[in-house]
A protein has these predicted regions:
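An extracytoplasmic/periplasmic, membrane-proximal ligand-sensing/linker region
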Residues: 178, 195-209, 214-216, 224-226, ...
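Bacterial signal peptide processing site
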Residues: 21-23
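A structural signal for short loop-to-beta-strand junctions that line the ligand-binding cleft
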Residues: 102-115, 120-121, 241-250
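Pocket-lining segment of extracytoplasmic ligand-binding domains
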Residues: 88-90, 98-100, 126, 130, ...
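Bilobed "Venus flytrap"/periplasmic-binding protein-like clamshell domains
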Residues: 25-53, 59, 119-185, 300, ...
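Secondary-structure end/capping motifs
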Residues: 52, 57, 161, 165-172, ...
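Extracytoplasmic small-molecule ligand-binding "clamshell" domains
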Residues: 41-77, 245-246, 332
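C-terminal motif of bacterial Sec signal peptides marking the signal peptidase cleavage site
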Residues: 16-19
């Protein structure tokens, strides 16, 4: 039944899109992150969904692996990617020209919507767990994520909030799967693996019997971290989310945002936004974290102006859109 409904939806959109008349490429790239996290499968699945709807127009959308949010900004700027998934932190800093983008504002960056929360997973070998919160990483060999990645930037920002710097840990720069592999081999004490629940690399960590734990974040630590950049909120990883996880884990999350650029065709972005949010069940089949992808919450935590096409879609859905999310190009049309 679900397959028939999906096919019916595809046929409807194929009919609608066949009437669209705009310049288009044959291949559009969606920048994601390393293969062990959530960005990659979500981006690949999104590309498959969009490709199915644009099949008769011979347009393909490909999810591509990358080092993460920071590299994704570069890929967008260089024209090597047309869409990207970014951490809320990186998207905000790039759009505002703040933080690591101080003096380098990306004025053309546009958001499409929040897809799912990026849940912080600080993991540490049980032998080094003392308080059970993220302060336990002090003095340990700890991967902050690949260099020039959103993981590195969010991890360093969180560390700054609890008054830790890279000099307070033995810093490594590894992807998700490599982090767990290095912990298993005894070469690493822990690492930061932010992603939607469940994270495949952490599922592997628990399922393989690795004696490691996900560290919690205290209320005081949340406040201190948000004093640096206000983008995180409380998130509970419910018991049973991972193998052998018997209790809830109190951590934090920030929004994961689908973005593009202001020069992307408005009609195409409108259609892609509509396709994505109206095929939620399909996306859940790709990765369980997509269960939190909803039109009603799609603008939560966004600080980056919406693309005009996405703005039109959410306006049609009756979603209240805050003034700072209105793109400059729509403001100019009103004047």
């Amino acid at each position: 039944m679900k397959g028939k409904l999906f096919l019916f939806t595809v046929l409807i959109f194929t009919f609608v899109l066949s009437g669209c008349n705009f310049e288009k490429k044959e291949i559009y790239n969606i920048a994601t992150a390393t293969t062990g996290g959530t960005y990659y499968p979500i981006g690949v699945g999104m590309g498959q969904l969009w490709t199915e709807h644009y099949r008769e127009q011979n347009i393909k959308f490909n999810g591509q692996a990358s080092a993460g949010s920071v590299e994704n900004i570069d890929l967008l700027k260089n024209g090597e990617a047309d869409f990207a998934i970014l951490q809320g932190l990186i998207s905000t800093q790039a759009a505002e020209g703040s933080g690591i983008y101080e003096g380098d504002q990306y004025e053309e960056l546009r958001s499409v919507g929040m897809i799912w929360p990026n849940v912080e997973h600080f993991v540490l070998m049980e032998d080094f767990v003392e308080s059970g919160d993220i302060s336990d990483i002090a003095g340990r060999s700890f991967s902050v994520g690949p260099q020039a990645s959103g993981t590195e930037q969010s991890t360093v920002t969180m560390m700054e909030g609890i008054e830790l710097g890279k000099s307070d840990i033995r810093t490594e720069y590894l992807g998700y799967d490599d982090t767990i592999s290095a912990m298993r081999d005894g070469r690493l004490n822990g690492g930061s693996l932010p992603a939607g629940v469940p994270v495949s690399a952490i599922t592997d960590m628990y399922a393989s019997g690795l004696n490691a734990a996900i560290l919690e974040v205290t209320d005081e630590q949340i406040d201190d971290i948000n004093d640096i950049v206000h983008t995180w909120y409380r998130y509970t990883i419910e018991a049973g989310s991972y193998p052998r996880q018997e209790e809830d884990i109190d951590t934090i999350a920030q929004p994961n945002i689908l973005v593009t650029t202001s020069d992307m065709d408005e009609e195409m972005v409108y259609n892609l936004t509509k396709i994505l949010f109206e095929n939620r069940e399909y996306m859940i089949g790709i990765h369980n974290s997509a269960r939190e992808m909803q039109v009603e919450t799609a603008l939560e935590g966004l600080n980056t102006p919406l693309h005009a096409g996405a703005y039109r879609y959410f306006e049609e859905q009756g979603i209240e859109i805050e003034a700072h999310l209105k793109p400059e190009e729509l403001r100019e049309e009103e004047n």
